[in-house]
């Protein structure tokens, strides 16, 4: 169904800067441009940007997908900020603070910021909206987008749906209008905490699913692991202030199922590689892109202990990644836990 003229005009006035030239940032930039949103795309690797300017595609990550006419790759990040009505950040969580620090001195007052990063800040374990509050101030309009999304499927026009969460409904609605299209449905939420935690913790659980499948434990095990993983996720999010219904939605259960069951997931592939005997560094090199769950396992387990939240699956992922536990032994530890009521 065609959009109303008024909404099309709104989109054409919402010049958006996408920060991050990986597969996900590029996919979102293409999505925005297809939606008639004038879009600028910046990446840290200036040689990569220069190549995108010439070829009109991202040969490194999405080589078969041409850029729409309204998508413009750029090399001058600070200069672009003066032309921007909203900013979308799609970088790994380890790069989120450095990018925000770079944006902070040049971003026009109260230009809305949305991020599509699915992780917690490494080292501190902070939610990314806390980093925004620290660097941009308490009144800055911000939102987060999360849900079951693989970049290649999004640019192929395969249908999916996501959640955009913001503390102000107007901000969530504005970003939702920019992203919403014929095959990309956007719902809004006010649960900034729950949406962020769904996107971060599911990465850890996907490593567990990859380990399980890599060891040949089968569909029963995978289904049980996803279900008990969801219980851990809900427990953790509630302790942090998230809402239960958020974790039953797209940014929780939806993304968890996707990431645990499809080999497009880098986190799942990490688990598969570990089950096959690869060391962590070998597996990460083999995958060749950021694997958010590896860093998230550290901060999730540490924060769970601070909050007195029991997360046995996440704990065993941590033990495999950083304490030398064999993947098969980790599964045995989980299976031998004391019998208890399901929702105790």
UniProtKB/Swiss-Prot annotation:
One Gene Ontology term, aspect cellular component: cytosol
Principal subcellular localization: cytoplasm
Keywords annotated in UniProt: Cytoplasm, Lipid biosynthesis, Lipid metabolism, NAD, NADP, Nucleotide-binding, Oxidoreductase, Phospholipid biosynthesis, Phospholipid metabolism
EC annotation from Swiss-Prot or TrEMBL: 1.1.1.94
Keyword Plastid included in the entry's annotation: no
SUPFAM superfamilies xref list: 6-phosphogluconate dehydrogenase C-terminal domain-like (SSF48179), NAD(P)-binding Rossmann-fold domains (SSF51735)
Reaction equations catalysed: sn-glycerol 3-phosphate + NAD(+) = dihydroxyacetone phosphate + NADH + H(+); sn-glycerol 3-phosphate + NADP(+) = dihydroxyacetone phosphate + NADPH + H(+)
BP GO annotations: carbohydrate metabolic process; glycerol-3-phosphate biosynthetic process; glycerol-3-phosphate catabolic process; glycerophospholipid biosynthetic process
Pathway entry: Membrane lipid metabolism; glycerophospholipid metabolism
Highest taxon listed in the record's lineage: Bacteria
PANTHER family reported in the protein's UniProt record: GLYCEROL-3-PHOSPHATE DEHYDROGENASE, GLYCEROL-3-PHOSPHATE DEHYDROGENASE [NAD(+)] 2, CHLOROPLASTIC
The protein, known as: Glycerol-3-phosphate dehydrogenase [NAD(P)+]
């Amino acid at each position: 169904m065609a959009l109303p003229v008024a909404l099309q005009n709104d989109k054409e006035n919402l010049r958006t800067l996408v920060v991050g030239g990986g597969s996900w940032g590029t996919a979102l930039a293409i999505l925005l441009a297809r939606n008639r949103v004038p879009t600028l795309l910046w990446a840290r690797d200036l040689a990569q940007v220069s190549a995108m300017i010439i070829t009109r595609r991202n040969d490194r990550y999405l080589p078969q997908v041409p850029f729409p006419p309204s998508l413009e790759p750029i090399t001058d990040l600070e200069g672009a900020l003066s032309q921007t009505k909203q900013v979308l950040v799609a970088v790994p969580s380890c790069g989120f603070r450095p990018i925000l620090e770079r944006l902070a001195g040049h971003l026009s007052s109260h230009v809305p910021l949305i991020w599509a990063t699915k992780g917690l800040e490494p080292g501190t374990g902070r939610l990314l909206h806390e980093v925004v509050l620290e660097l941009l101030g308490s009144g800055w309009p911000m939102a987060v987008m999360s849900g079951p999304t693989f970049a290649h499927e999004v640019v192929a026009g395969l249908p999916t749906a996501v959640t955009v969460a913001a503390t102000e409904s107007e901000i969530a609605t504005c970003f939702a209008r920019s992203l919403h299209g014929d095959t990309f449905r956007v719902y809004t939420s006010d649960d900034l905490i729950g949406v962020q935690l769904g996107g971060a913790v599911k990465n850890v659980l996907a490593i567990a699913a990859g380990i399980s499948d890599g060891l040949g434990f089968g569909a029963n095990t995978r289904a049980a692991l996803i279900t008990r993983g969801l219980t851990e996720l809900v427990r953790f999010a509630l302790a942090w202030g998230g809402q239960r219904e958020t974790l039953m939605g797209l940014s929780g259960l939806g993304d968890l199922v996707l990431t645990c069951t499809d080999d497009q997931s880098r986190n799942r592939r990490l688990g598969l590689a570990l089950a096959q005997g690869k060391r962590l560094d070998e597996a990460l090199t083999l995958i060749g892109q950021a694997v958010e769950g590896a860093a998230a396992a550290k901060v999730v387990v540490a924060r769970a202990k601070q909050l007195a939240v029991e997360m046995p699956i996440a704990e065993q992922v941590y033990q495999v990644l950083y304490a030398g536990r064999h993947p098969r032994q980790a599964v045995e530890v989980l299976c031998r836990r004391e019998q208890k009521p399901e929702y105790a």
